[in-house]
Structures are given as C-alpha cells and as structure tokens.
C-alpha cells in the first residue's frame, strides 16, 4: 500500500514541498532564512489578529486602544511587543535572505526572484501602514511625510495624495483605510509566498557552489527540517530576548506621545528598516528625483539578472566581486545610520556619497568587475 502522503491530493502537495523535496546536500545556514521568514509571517498574522480584536481605527480612540491593550488585556503588552519587534525580525531575515540571493546568484531564477522583489515591496507597504496605526506623533507625521511624496508625481500628484488621505490631511479616513489594508495585505503576502515557492520548486534550490546539484540531492526531511527547527529556535530566542528585555529598543520615543497635527517632532524618521531608503530619498534636493531614487533603490534588485556578466553563478570563487559585495553591505549600513541623523553637515554629504556609491556599485562597478574576472580566469 502506497503511503497516504504520496497519494492524497492535499497532503501530496505538502509532501512534495517539505518532505520528499530533493534538496542540494551542501546548502548552508544562509538557506535557513526562507523558512524563518515563513515563521515570522505566521507570528505576525497571529499576533496581529489578536491585536485587531482590541484595536479601534478611529483618530479619537486609536492611541488609547493601544494603551488599553498594553494595560488591561491579558498579556496584551506581550502580544503588542511581539508584533512590533516581530516586524524588525522579519526585516532582518528579509535583508539577509535578499543578500544571500545576491551573493550566491539566486537571481538567475527570474520568476522566483521577481516575485520575491514584489513580495519585498508588499511587505514594506504593510509595515509602513502598520506603523501608522498606534497614532502616536511619529505615526502621524511619518504618514504625512511619506504619503506627501506622491504629490511629486506630475499633474496627478496632489489629487492622488488627497485621494489616498480621503480628505485634505491625514485624518480618520486615512487611519481607517490604512487599518483595512494592513489587515488584508499579509494574506496577499501569504498568497505571493506560495507563488514564490511554486516557482522555486520548478527549478529546485540554488547552492553555495552555484553548480548544478542534480547528482547530489537529499530529501528535505529529516535533514533540513531539523536544520530549520534549529534556526526557528534561535530566531524565537532572539525575538523573546528583545521583547522581554528591551521592547522599545528599536522604536521611537515620540510614538508614546499622542498624534498632534499642530506640533511637528524635531526629527521625522521611519522605522529603522526603512532608514537606508529614507537616506537615499533625502540625499537628492529635488522632490521628484528623491522619490524616483527611493523607488529605484528597491526596484534595482529586478535588474540584477540583466546586469549579471560573470560566467560563474555565485560569488563563492570570485574574490573581487566578494569585496564589492561587502562594500555594498557596509554602504547600506552607512545609509541606515545617516537616515536616522538630522539633515545637517556632515551627514548630508555622507548620505549623498553613500547614495551615489550604492547605485554606482550595482549598475557600473559590479558588472565591470565580473567581466574582468572572466578575463582573469580566461573564460
């Protein structure tokens, strides 16, 4: 008798995705982040669901409903901080996952990569709208500043911003619709994740060597289920250390002040995981130019398959490209730091230099170095 997991129409899908999936035997811990992102998504949806049971999306009561969750709801403070810091963990895993894809040339799987970039955009939109919901000072002013960027679009900009706001400023209508979108988008993300996995399993996983691994594959279970469980335990441990010891470490103190349209905070800045893009936005004096640079800083990921000039897939055997990759990583850390600093000397010039370096490395230097490596290796 054949095993039910191989014959049952539903269980068969799970079996082919997580149990009998042929997996390259040499994939390293960098391949753990896919499953960790799945775990983060589950944590965020569950905690978000419980928060939504007590939250009210009204400008008069939103801030106090969050206070009520933290003070009066059983373990409400825990659920709220797991959700807030879970978002930070989500983005740490996301950026490491993308970095792994860039380093090992996983972007040569076009469909998987492009769906991944769309996923990144969707998750960023979800996180931005979630940050607005507590209706603190930084929520309100962050929403005002970021949505206002759309007014840079020629001709339709102002009308578009007022349409998104549902009025002439960020108010009740804006908060209500942001809550609605923040609730529905994670389910759209889940659907996109399934499409992402569908395309990945069409080709099979990449591996550190970048070579075809058909001759050396092992079943996903038990080898990589155990490995993923270890990763999940480490992620959960670090999340709970953050939540229970310093839950406000990554937040902004301004968000503990209720939103006040008449009082602007001295430094308006988004959450830490958007600071690199915010720094790129601020480094261009022109409003439309800044918005285009902001969008292109993420959209540029879609160009990697086109810009890939190397005869080798990953960077494992390409020391010059490795150096460039780590310079790019350091540049992103610099941009993140600059995004949190006030707009004054010397931060302005550092931000502008780091922004130029970011685009130059990706668009010009990396393809040229790849071609040089081909010549050096006589390929």
Curated annotation (Swiss-Prot):
Signal peptide: none annotated. GO terms for molecular function: metal ion binding; ubiquinol-cytochrome-c reductase activity. Binds 2 heme b groups non-covalently. InterPro entries: Cyt_b/b6_C (IPR005798), Cyt_b/b6_C_sf (IPR036150), Cyt_b/b6_N (IPR005797), Cytb/b6-like_sf (IPR027387), Cytochrome_b (IPR030689), Cytochrome_b_C_euk/bac (IPR048260), Cytochrome_b_N_euk/bac (IPR048259), Di-haem_cyt_TM (IPR016174). Its cofactor is heme b. PROSITE patterns: CYTB_CTER, CYTB_NTER. GO terms for cellular component: mitochondrial inner membrane; respiratory chain complex III. It is a multi-pass membrane protein. It holds the Pfam family Cytochrome_B. Heme b b566 binds at residues 97, 196. Heme b b562 binds at residues 83, 182. It is found in: Mitochondrion inner membrane. The chain crosses the membrane at residues 33-53, 77-98, 113-133, 178-198, 226-246, 288-308, 320-340, 347-367. Keywords: Electron transport, Heme, Iron, Membrane, Metal-binding, Mitochondrion, Mitochondrion inner membrane, Respiratory chain, Transmembrane, Transmembrane helix, Transport, Ubiquinone. The keyword Coiled coil does not apply. Heme 1 (or BL or b562) is low-potential and absorbs at about 562 nm, and heme 2 (or BH or b566) is high-potential and absorbs at about 566 nm. Belongs to the cytochrome b family. PANTHER family: CYTOCHROME B. This is Cytochrome b. The lineage of its organism: Eukaryota, Metazoa, Chordata, Craniata, Vertebrata. The gene is MT-CYB.
